[in-house]
């Protein structure tokens, strides 16, 4: 009995002794909307710094647009559990996905594989182990077919709601990796990061988003004109 108690106390003390850390993730994304085909074509660069005390041999990544791909996704199954059939009866042409992924790490091609349960989570095998305090540059093209709005990503005609649309690393923290599928109910546990995003749209569109506009004097003037119309 004493051995069990001592072991339990040791585990608690050991857990409190570990230091908190966050991985450092910086995104650079260039993406273009095709409003005829309802698609996104993009290229992504991610600078990833390993602030943990562990050496990483692989990274878990979320490719959440695949949640809209088939009836076997965690999203589809959640809808069914909740008695919602709108995903089940969505036509194939109105569903979504992400493909054209071709990952490289510091210029070296990296292999990857799907999670055993979820089609919207993948594991990227690193060409070289990522040691503590080291950084890598992750690059990949990507192509997203936007679904008709079923959940938070999609379109209704030429109105677009774009969220969780790019490949992103899962959180790695003091408790290890946190790969998770996209779900309609619940929120997302993601690494804090910085974003530099270039978005190309047909001229008739306007973006409503957070962030700091770079070189957007004409956009600010347009918004000011709308404000004046509203005050009139």
Please annotate each region the language model reported:
Residues 18, 29-32, 46, 111-113, ...:
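Beta-strand-rich interaction surfaces with strong enrichment in secreted/lumenal proteins
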Residues 3-13:
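Sec-dependent N-terminal signal peptides
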Residues 131-140:
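Short Pro-Gly-centered flexible turn/kink motifs
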Residues 1-4, 94-96, 105:
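Positively charged n-region of N-terminal signal peptides that target proteins for export
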Residues 48-52:
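Asparagine-centered strand-capping/turn motif at beta-strand->loop junctions
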Residues 16-41, 156-157:
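N-terminal, polar/Ser/Thr-rich
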């Amino acid at each position: 009995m004493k051995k069990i108690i001592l072991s339990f106390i040791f585990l608690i003390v050991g857990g409190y002794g570990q230091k908190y850390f966050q991985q450092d993730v910086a995104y650079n994304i260039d993406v273009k909307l095709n409003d005829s085909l309802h698609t996104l074509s993009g290229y992504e660069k991610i600078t990833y710094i390993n602030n943990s005390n562990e050496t990483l041999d692989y990274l878990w990544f979320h490719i959440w647009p695949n949640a809209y791909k088939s009836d076997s996704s965690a999203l589809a199954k959640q809808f069914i559990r909740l008695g919602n059939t709108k995903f089940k009866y969505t036509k194939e042409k109105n569903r979504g996905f992400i493909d054209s992924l071709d990952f490289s790490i510091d210029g070296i091609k990296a292999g990857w594989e799907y999670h055993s349960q979820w089609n919207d989570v993948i594991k990227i095998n690193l060409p070289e182990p990522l040691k503590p305090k080291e950084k890598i540059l992750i690059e990949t093209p990507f192509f997203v077919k936007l679904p008709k709005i079923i959940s938070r990503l999609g379109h209704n005609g030429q109105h677009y709601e774009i969220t969780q649309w790019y490949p992103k690393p899962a959180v790695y923290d003091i408790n290890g990796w946190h790969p998770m599928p996209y779900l309609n109910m619940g929120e997302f546990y993601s690494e804090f990061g910085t974003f530099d995003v270039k978005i190309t749209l047909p001229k008739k569109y306007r973006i409503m988003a957070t962030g700091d506009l770079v070189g957007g004097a004409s956009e600010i003037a347009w918004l000011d004109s709308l404000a004046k119309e509203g005050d009139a």
